């Protein structure tokens, strides 16, 4: 059997989608690897990319080149946000690179069965002939899919195309024959088709409940790559969580581009949380990220339940009202302070994280001082800081008053020092206390309910497998299983 290598860059959404694709390839009998670990011949490399910063794009190009060198006969299928916005530049890298649009990424759920059908019918043909046929199949699939519209309708088995609806391979010299009809179905590309019932690369399950964004932040072009906000219907979310719970999963992470824009009929994200808690029994629920405006009274009621992990990552970006206005953010510094106060009023010392952009055009020393002061005062235990990266097509790309890279780098370093100090203080607060935790993939570490990643320093005879829920006591910078 052949192998497929899957590599993922960027956000949790990308990781969820890659896990889903990996599960589908395994289901069709392919070996799946991440990293250079495969013993079977690798015929396809899937690279799920990010476009948040120019460095993310550079990393994607380096990875593509590495994979092309490592696997001289394999196809590099590049998808994700970078592939959506810059397909031509990626495909110009090599004839073996095919950029599959990120907006239609859910259509890749068809790919494993397509390639399995091709493999079954190729007979004893050499690997290069199979790869040739696969390249033609991928190109045909892409051509058909990009002409279709997107829909938020959940893909039922009758809605999804089957192996009898695969693209016809024509004009491919020496390609194995594939006796299939033209790709006449479906009339739309179903969103949320990439759903992982099992997880190969992570110990914790994740579900994508929302995609896209309707906001117009000056620095971000993810909305161009992923499109308008769309949500998975509430009953489908609950069904997927219940299925994970039935399989013994101890935790699920709910993720999306902008969870504050989740809507299913009259149900918003707070309502979704309430319903999940009501309709499940043991599984713990973690939220990937939040906007300050998401912290409403209804949301606070929902997170008061002990099965909602006390870990909240806020998309903050700046502590300066002036910079927030230039960024076109929909909240003020006062809103951030209020959101943090409200979260702490409901849960005891939750882990609070935030995203910070430094060096945004026009950011002064006073603006940066406001951001530092905010992060110090609010005691954010996790600070994800990165320098502003001008993205083509965004309002900020053409803004004047650019901050020199040297100054932006100094501000990044200063914020990282503060982040380390805040984290140490938070870890010290919980030292000696008991917490719930999930055993990580390596089984040598745990991730606590409040997002402390700790090495297991004493097992106490407790048998703990990856993904299992355990009680631990924090001891200095480690965990003792109870």
From Swiss-Prot:
Start and end residues of each MTTase N-terminal domain: 2-120
Positions of [4Fe-4S] cluster 2 binding: 213, 217, 220
InterPro entries: Elp3/MiaA/NifB-like_rSAM, Methylthiotransferase, Methylthiotransferase_CS, Methylthiotransferase_N, Methylthiotransferase_N_sf, MiaB-like_bact, rSAM, rSAM_horseshoe
Pfam families per UniProt: Radical_SAM, UPF0004
Catalytic activity: N(6)-L-threonylcarbamoyladenosine(37) in tRNA + (sulfur carrier)-SH + AH2 + 2 S-adenosyl-L-methionine = 2-methylsulfanyl-N(6)-L-threonylcarbamoyladenosine(37) in tRNA + (sulfur carrier)-H + 5'-deoxyadenosine + L-methionine + A + S-adenosyl-L-homocysteine + 2 H(+)
Residues engaged in binding [4Fe-4S] cluster 1: 11, 50, 81
PROSITE patterns: MTTASE_N, MTTASE_RADICAL, RADICAL_SAM
Top-level division of the source organism's lineage: Bacteria
Cofactor(s) essential for the protein: [4Fe-4S] cluster
Transmembrane region(s): none
Keywords tagged on the record: 4Fe-4S, Cytoplasm, Iron, Iron-sulfur, Metal-binding, S-adenosyl-L-methionine, Transferase, tRNA processing
Cofactor note: Binds 2 [4Fe-4S] clusters. One cluster is coordinated with 3 cysteines and an exchangeable S-adenosyl-L-methionine.
Enzyme class: transferase
EC identifiers of the protein: 2.8.4.5
NCBIfam families cross-referenced by the UniProt entry: MiaB-like-C
Name used for this protein in its record: Threonylcarbamoyladenosine tRNA methylthiotransferase MtaB
